[in-house]
Amino acid sequence: MAYLELKNVYKSYGTDENVTNVLSDINLTIEEGEFVAIVGFTGSGKTTLVNLINGLLKPTSGEVLFKGAPVVGTSHERGVIFQNYSLLPWLTVGQNVYMAVKEAFPKQSKAELKKRVNDYVEMVSLSPAINKRPKELSGGMRQRVAVARALAMNPEMIIMDEPLGALDALTRGNLQDEILNIWSKDKRTALLITNDVDEGIYMADRIIPLKPGPNATLGPEFKIDIERPRDKTAMNDNPNYKKTRNAIIEYLMDIGDQRKSVSQQEYILPEIAPKSFVA
């Protein structure tokens, strides 16, 4: 039994003649402890896919199964890290994390909850900022709060929806390493949504492209045959890295060209000759 499984999943919006088919015939299997990355173009339906897996949306048809049971709503078993930090601005770092753990562990004492908060804030190197509010933090620090909040709930699966996309290169690289360090400690199942092929290769066991929408579907998987822990500098000289990267980019370019060709056919404007208004 797969840990996470999507079977023939379709998702559309609208009714009757105004239906937009966002996702079409999505089939995905992720095993326990695996780190899988899905790469795709902006607007291809990646966030819709995340919301289906997390239970924020229901599929139009098909099944989303977590540990063999249908996903019928959100659960702290599946922790989500969004690109938008979604921190409550009137609460401190510690209070933002505390709200999450209080919801996830209602039977724990206040002391136990505070210890959990402190442990995870320390894990993302934010202990000196635990009493600061979001407006006092940089973008990278805010995203680390979001990481701490998601992980402090002790989810069995971590779902990341382009969590590092808005960060500068240095902060992004540091957070990639922090997420990998946390993941490697207990090998929680992880799903990363990204539009960065290099990020996917560095972090994941497998990369699966999502074709452009509408009617977006998953392409072939690419296994990352590079030993862990991975070194970004050394990877540049790794023949498996070069081969995998080239194959993924070539595939994405091909489907991108196909989509452009279809779009041009769909939106060819008629030739209209101007009327002469001269009597």
Question: What are the residue ranges of the model-derived segments?
Answer:
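The feature captures the beta-strand-to-loop junction immediately N-terminal to the Walker
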Residues: 39-41
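Helix-to-loop junction immediately C-terminal to a conserved catalytic motif
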Residues: 54
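Conserved ABC transporter NBD signature motif
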Residues: 62-73
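Hydrophobic anchor residue at the start of the ABC signature
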Residues: 81, 147
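Short coil-to-helix segment of the ABC ATPase nucleotide-binding domain corresponding to the Q-loop/switch region
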Residues: 91-100
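Conserved ABC ATPase "signature" region
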Residues: 109-129, 181
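Conserved ABC ATPase signature
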Residues: 133-137, 141
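A short, proline-enriched helix->beta-strand linker immediately N-terminal to the Walker B motif
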Residues: 152-156
